[in-house]
């Protein structure tokens, strides 16, 4: 596939990346940039005696004691590593403080993984769910521990030596999304995860409502973006399983192969609906269009570096693998940017109201403004279509 320096809007690639739900997993010997677990952060401790009582009778060996560590860097849900009788488990719970309605629904993520895992092996298996908030103060669940690494700022040296490593990971990443969207939602019963009819309309309205509830500053440009998304909704292709947060740092890669995806993580927003909404959000993270208002706030994206798929290559491989018409992908990219802005605004709203003391969130207001400016500039840009490819599905 030919390389290209332009995105779906005909503008240069962005050098900007937001990471607000990241996790790092590794075994010994990997780069310090991919640290595994560490001590539990102050203020995020769990009630170990209460947890131990709950585990007894559910996990063999729990009566002999448990050890607890934490996966670093997450900006929303909290993720811990449990060791019980020599076996590792992952515990997931929602964030501290008040959260937006329907956000960070650990019970739903547990049930989604229960349904998806048998049909998409990259989704981790889950074991136990507690909806009794008296145990840890929030709903939580246990799932299997998978080993691998998540790429962020650079490729570890032992992998960088592999021929064409970045290109091969790019291919595997796109192909994994293609497989996810190929799961038969009718035969597997996954259609029960959502209501495909009216998916885009509900997405725009639902995220607009979340924005209104979390607003801290007036942003007329966001009102314009919401109106544009409401008035320009394209016809959706046939519905599929939708991850709703598919990005490089939500995918666990093999430590010794460029072609193998060990796990896809963070399924709390998964549903069934328009697969191009997934693709649009993924493209927002992959390599963004250049925007002056973001230059001072961003950092170079790993996928903007030499060897990685360009956005054109990414879109073309997806089109060839699915046969879907991507001529309206520009709409879905604006939708993705809009959703990212709302997610960050919800986190910033919690910080402004003192519901979290995490200082990592103090500059999220500036990031939100940059995203809104980017979305607003894109809806006014004349080239909004990608060439038609494949057959409409």
What are the roles of these predicted feature ranges?
Residues 8-10, 14-17:
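Short hydrophobic alpha-helical segments enriched in small aliphatic residues
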Residues 29-61:
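Juxta-kinase regulatory segment immediately upstream of eukaryotic protein kinase catalytic domains
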